[in-house]
Amino acid sequence: MLAFPIGQRVSVRCQGLVLGGYGGWVSLGTASANPVYQNGFIPQDEIPVRLRKREGIEAMRPDTLRIAELEAVHVGCFIAFENVQFVDGELGSAWCDSDADSDRHLVDERGDTLLVRTSRYARFATRPLPAGSGYLEGILGWFNKSYQLRVIDARNAVMDSPRFIPCMDSDGND
């Protein structure tokens, strides 16, 4: 499996691939054999031919935002959040269930929440979620009318501060 660090320049060979949409997200893939989907996954053995690393890695710093500040312009961007934690009901859970990609929920001090989506194939999928509060960064996505954060590596979570009690509404009122 190819892995690209954030900021890696890549070339994509698109000949023979098709654009499709799924859950409000545009994707590039193979022609789909299933009429439910507009395109399919690129076979694993084709990935090294279709995606090639180019010279140079651009140093990337995430934009630090509040959950309430998320907008469509941030989709596909490397972003970060401070003073966040996973919701109480998910403490003790792994980043991902073993049988399917999974959703977890991040909350900030104002009570705003964001879905965190983790692939069951992520190297850190079986590790427990951080139990404290702190900093988390990832790539923002959009699926079925909801923002979702894709964390690249568990090291992108520095959440060792004490937990907080979120406000009851998203206006920051008690």
PLM regions: where:
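OB-fold nucleic-acid-binding modules
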Residues: 1-174
